[in-house]
């Protein structure tokens, strides 16, 4: 099996971090944080099934992604995860708590409003691609990337856009998988095992982490909450603060 979809950063003997991207994303997105802020850390950042260079085949479920991730972990890791990836991380911690040292959940998307998810999925099907890079850039700026460093946005466009047979551009992901995954985010909120230290970062300008979600996590004995003044792309918009949070559990 090719491992072109597994992005690795840092020294082979560094403390291990498994970094999980969000829906429509890709593993290389973690490169700026890993190389620029956590150079001594060994970061393993896979493209999740249906994204980037990973397998596009179903089943498109949290459980299948967990099964995909387990072989990457030869020892327990700190799992740093964004949005959809954070939901995956929680399921990983429940399935294999022996492999998770701590969780850092960046604006997690879990137990979301089904109406919201239906509308997002419909919008994605209605607009699967763009006329050109400029249109893709505008879409990113209108959907949570406005407070991200422009250089990171340009790197995202260069890495993650691919051409379509019709001469347009689209993200390097599989629309059937991504559309299906929006439904996974409507599944009930579940919590990690109580013994695992869990840090939740809520993005103040994002709608995903509700007071009810925070209240549920606050029942955990080893829970820490942070709120950053940013939109949904936490690691890209607030890299220094994100680094501090990761270091707190390393």
Residue map of PLM features:
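Conserved loop-alpha-helix segment in the C-terminal half of the alpha/beta-hydrolase fold
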Residues: 195-231
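Active-site loop/oxyanion-hole signature of alpha/beta-hydrolase fold enzymes
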Residues: 2, 9, 32, 44-81
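Gly/Ala-rich beta-loop-alpha elbow adjacent to hydrolase catalytic centers
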Residues: 81, 85, 89
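Conserved HGGG/HGGXW glycine-rich cap/lid loop of the alpha/beta-hydrolase fold
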Residues: 7-55
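Catalytic histidine-centered segment of alpha/beta-hydrolase-like enzymes
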Residues: 230-239, 243
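The conserved beta1-alpha1 loop
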Residues: 18-22, 82, 202
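Flexible "cap/lid" loop of the alpha/beta hydrolase fold
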Residues: 94, 99-133
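Conserved alpha/beta-hydrolase catalytic His-Asp/Glu region
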Residues: 131-186
């Amino acid at each position: 099996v090719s491992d072109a979809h597994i992005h690795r950063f840092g020294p082979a003997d560094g403390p291990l971090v498994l970094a999980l991207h969000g829906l429509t994303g890709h593993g290389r997105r973690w490169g700026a944080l890993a190389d620029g802020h956590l150079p001594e850390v060994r970061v393993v950042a896979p493209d999740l099934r249906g994204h980037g260079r990973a397998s596009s085949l179903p089943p498109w479920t949290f459980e299948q992604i967990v099964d995909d991730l387990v072989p990457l972990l030869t020892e327990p890791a700190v799992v740093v995860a964004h949005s959809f990836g954070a939901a995956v991380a929680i399921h990983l911690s429940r399935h294999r708590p022996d492999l998770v040292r701590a969780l850092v959940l960046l604006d997690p998307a879990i137990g979301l409003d089904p109406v919201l998810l239906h509308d997002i999925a419909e919008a994605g099907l209605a607009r699967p691609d763009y006329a050109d890079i400029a249109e893709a850039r505008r879409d990113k700026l209108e959907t949570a990337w406005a407070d991200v460093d422009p250089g990171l946005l340009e790197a995202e466009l260069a890495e993650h856009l691919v051409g379509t047979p019709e001469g347009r551009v689209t993200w390097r992901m599989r629309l059937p998988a991504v559309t299906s995954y929006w439904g996974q985010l409507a599944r009930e909120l579940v919590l990690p095992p109580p013994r695992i230290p869990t840090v939740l970062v809520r993005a103040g300008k994002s709608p995903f982490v509700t007071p009810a979600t925070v209240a549920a996590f606050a029942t955990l004995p080893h829970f820490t909450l942070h709120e950053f003044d940013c939109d949904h792309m936490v690691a890209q918009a607030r890299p220094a603060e994100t680094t501090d949070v990761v270091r707190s559990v390393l």
